[in-house]
Curated annotation (Swiss-Prot):
Signal sequence range: none
Family: Belongs to the ATPase epsilon chain family.
GO cellular component, one term: proton-transporting ATP synthase complex
Protein name: ATP synthase epsilon chain, chloroplastic
Recorded name of the encoding gene: atpE
Known function: Produces ATP from ADP in the presence of a proton gradient across the membrane.
Chief location of this protein within or outside the cell: plastid
Transmembrane feature ranges: none
Length: 134
């Protein structure tokens, strides 16, 4: 038995396929979902979700949203989603280093919050390309 995973963004269905397992970046940490998981709704943080199908792990950068798990269906609504194939490795690494530097140099609460948001997005994109080994 498998999970039916659907990742939707405001402008398209990003992923709609079967999976054996999915690991979600929730606001309280990573959460794994296997078949026959208890029903739940959870908020998703900016981060990497890992989708396992046929012994292959597919990393996807998610930019915050919600997930609904019910009857072996995982429906994910996110602001944005990216796969390693659409992210440039060099661009992702440069953006990550720049975001890290800006976060370290941020002063004041507003600047720190904005820098943290940019850092999380850049880190998720960088982790996706590094995980796939592109």
């Amino acid at each position: 038995m498998t999970l039916q995973v659907c990742i939707m963004t405001p402008d398209r269905i990003f992923w709609n396929d079967q999976a054996d397992e999915i690991i979600l970046p929730t606001n309280t940490g990573q959460m794994g979902v296997l078949t026959n998981h208890a029903p739940l709704i959870t908020a998703l943080d900016i981060g990497v979700t890992l989708i396992r199908s046929n012994s292959n792990w597919n990393p996807v950068a998610l930019m915050g949203g919600f997930a609904l798990v019910k009857q072996n269906q995982v429906t994910i609504l996110v602001n944005e989603a990216e796969s390693a194939q659409t992210i440039g490795v060099d661009e992702a690494e440069i953006a990550f280093q720049e975001a890290k530097t800006k976060l370290e140099q941020s002063q004041g609460e507003k600047q720190r919050v904005e820098a943290t948001f940019v850092f999380k997005r850049a880190r998720a994109r960088y982790q996706v390309v590094k995980q796939l080994g592109v």
